[in-house]
Curated annotation (Swiss-Prot):
<keyword id="KW-0862">Zinc</keyword>
<dbReference type="GO" id="GO:0005975">
    <property type="term" value="P:carbohydrate metabolic process"/>
</dbReference>
<dbReference type="InterPro" id="IPR050099">
    <property type="entry name" value="SIS_GmhA/DiaA_subfam"/>
</dbReference>
<feature type="binding site">
    <location>
        <begin position="65"/>
        <end position="67"/>
    </location>
    <ligand>
        <name>substrate</name>
    </ligand>
</feature>
<feature type="binding site">
    <location>
        <position position="188"/>
    </location>
    <ligand>
        <name>substrate</name>
    </ligand>
</feature>
<feature type="binding site">
    <location>
        <position position="140"/>
    </location>
    <ligand>
        <name>substrate</name>
    </ligand>
</feature>
<dbReference type="InterPro" id="IPR001347">
    <property type="entry name" value="SIS_dom"/>
</dbReference>
<dbReference type="GO" id="GO:0005737">
    <property type="term" value="C:cytoplasm"/>
</dbReference>
<dbReference type="GO" id="GO:2001061">
    <property type="term" value="P:D-glycero-D-manno-heptose 7-phosphate biosynthetic process"/>
</dbReference>
<comment type="similarity">
    <text>Belongs to the SIS family. GmhA subfamily.</text>
</comment>
<feature type="binding site">
    <location>
        <position position="78"/>
    </location>
    <ligand>
        <name>Zn(2+)</name>
    </ligand>
</feature>
<dbReference type="InterPro" id="IPR004515">
    <property type="entry name" value="Phosphoheptose_Isoase"/>
</dbReference>
<dbReference type="Pfam" id="PF13580">
    <property type="entry name" value="SIS_2"/>
</dbReference>
<feature type="binding site">
    <location>
        <position position="188"/>
    </location>
    <ligand>
        <name>Zn(2+)</name>
    </ligand>
</feature>
<comment type="function">
    <text>Catalyzes the isomerization of sedoheptulose 7-phosphate in D-glycero-D-manno-heptose 7-phosphate.</text>
</comment>
<feature type="binding site">
    <location>
        <begin position="135"/>
        <end position="137"/>
    </location>
    <ligand>
        <name>substrate</name>
    </ligand>
</feature>
<dbReference type="InterPro" id="IPR046348">
    <property type="entry name" value="SIS_dom_sf"/>
</dbReference>
């Protein structure tokens, strides 16, 4: 395969590529630190809201597009199956609205893509449930419509966003905005880390994840890894 002209480094220019690794990883780390220092109280409040919904029999719905759809599925799975193998707890009811290709394509074809998540919230959401929207721009219309519907029908709303927060910032009861206006990847890296921290906090708030709890639940569980 012919290498494209205009590449700044050849295949053997190891030092240039190592700089890319350092620049990318260090920028991502600095961005996460900025988000953590500016939003720790909000993240705790998000986790407390999710834990409260679970404890009262409600469920968490999650939606997003593209990489954010993958993050929605990732986080929903860790709520329902488990987050860390050292913490033993019941399944927690989280549903990613991004997994049913038949529902998504039917909604896009029959109602328009902007309505796909709203329709699924209408189907699965109930007053007292919680909707988490993920959007690196803050302006994904399908997510905007879903949060708007949820707010009007007795659900609480959360959002993990990027840029300046966009339209979704005003629709979420609680939101964290990653202050990055470039490519979506840096924002998504923060979002998945935030999601992991939130799951950890929810488990702690619900009484799971403590040393005492782990000792009581050790028998009968195999330690598995991905």
């Amino acid at each position: 395969m012919r290498r494209k002209s205009g590449c700044s480094a050849g295949l053997d220019d190891r030092s240039a590529y190592e700089e890319v690794v350092l620049d990318s990883m260090l920028y991502s780390a600095r961005l996460k630190e900025t988000v953590a220092r500016g939003n720790s109280a909000v993240v705790v409040a998000m986790a407390r809201l999710i834990a409260g919904v679970f404890e009262t029999g409600g469920k968490l719905l999650i939606c997003g597009n593209g990489g954010s759809a993958a993050d929605a599925q990732h986080l929903a799975t860790e709520f329902t199956i488990r987050y860390r193998s050292s913490v033993h707890r019941p399944a927690l009811p989280a549903i990613a609205l991004t997994t049913d290709s038949s529902a998504l394509t039917a909604g896009a074809n029959d109602l328009g893509y902007d309505e796909v998540f709203r329709r699924l919230v209408e189907a699965y959401g109930r007053p007292g449930d919680l909707l988490l929207g993920l959007s690196t721009s803050g302006n994904s219309r399908s997510v905007v419509h879903a949060l708007d519907y949820a707010r009007k029908h007795g659900m609480r709303t959360l959002a993990l966003l990027g840029g300046d927060g966009g339209a979704l910032k005003g629709l979420a009861d609680l939101s964290v905005v990653v202050p990055h206006n470039g490519s979506a990847d840096r924002v998504q890296e923060c979002h998945i880390t935030l999601g992991h921290v939130i799951i950890d906090l929810v488990e702690r708030m619900m009484g799971y994840g403590t040393e005492c709890n782990n000792q009581q639940n050790e028998q009968g569980y195999a330690d598995q890894t991905d």
